[in-house]
Amino acid sequence: MEALKKIAGVTAAQYVTDGMTIGLGTGSTAYYFVEEIGRRVKQEGLQVVGVTTSSVTSKQAEVLGIPLKSIDDIDSIDLTVDGADEVDKDFNGIKGGGAALLMEKIVATPTKEYIWVVDASKMVEHLGAFKLPVEVVQYGADRLFRVFEKAGYKPSFRMKGDSRLVTDMQNYIIDLDLGCIKDPVAFGHLLDGTVGVVEHGLFNGMVDKVIVASKDGVTVLEAPKAG
């Protein structure tokens, strides 16, 4: 599995060229993309500026010598490469297994080309077998938990040891065990309109390419262009 993740990450790095501003994703597959960019910066003199999606990725990039800028200091990003926890046939996805979904979505939004790197096990018919992360403000989180419970969403707080995990943005994550999300777009809109929800892990209609690594090789899937 790790070998497939590495292949996907290294393949994505081939899309990066001199002078780009690139979004550096978070997670076990995006890790290999960042490592390969670091190698190219050091060995090939690749000139890029990175924008990171988590404190973990920031530390990784700094160790590798990748120059970084804050999202607040840029207007657009040429290319962002990130992982995904599930991707369906309509190129909607669930992200946030690494608890970085808010920053990941903020970085993805001004990106000209958004690429996900996954192994073949992440490609699914319907989203929802992977629990859907919902980032919520700490104030009122228990009330919101009960709202989700009454709706039948089987919520659970993301934990770190014996305590609730706190994200880089100082929020909690409630994971929803939905089983199957029949209409990800509609459910995303529902969560968008829920007071106390900061962001959710449904990334609908955002990705441009999905690089899938399997035992048979690497496949690059192109999402249909809107309009």
Swiss-Prot record:
Q: Which reaction does it catalyse?
A: aldehydo-D-ribose 5-phosphate = D-ribulose 5-phosphate
What Pfam family is a match, any one? Rib_5-P_isom_A
InterPro entries with a match to the protein in the record:
NagB/RpiA_transferase-like (IPR037171), Ribose-5P_isomerase (IPR050262), Ribose5P_isomerase_typA_subgr (IPR020672), Ribose5P_isomerase_type_A (IPR004788)
- Biochemical pathway: Carbohydrate degradation; pentose phosphate pathway; D-ribose 5-phosphate from D-ribulose 5-phosphate (non-oxidative stage): step 1/1
Residue sites binding substrate per the record: T26, G27, S28, T29, D82, G83, A84, D85, K95, G96, G97, G98, K122
Q: Where are the transmembrane segments?
A: none
Q: Which UniProt keywords apply?
A: Isomerase
Query: Do the record's keywords include Chloroplast?
Result: no
GO MF terms listed in the record are: ribose-5-phosphate isomerase activity
Active-site annotation: E104
Tell me the function of this protein: Catalyzes the reversible conversion of ribose-5-phosphate to ribulose 5-phosphate.
| Protein family membership | Belongs to the ribose 5-phosphate isomerase family.
Q: What is this protein called?
A: Ribose-5-phosphate isomerase A
Gene source species: Streptococcus pyogenes serotype M18 (strain MGAS8232)
Q: Which gene encodes it?
A: rpiA
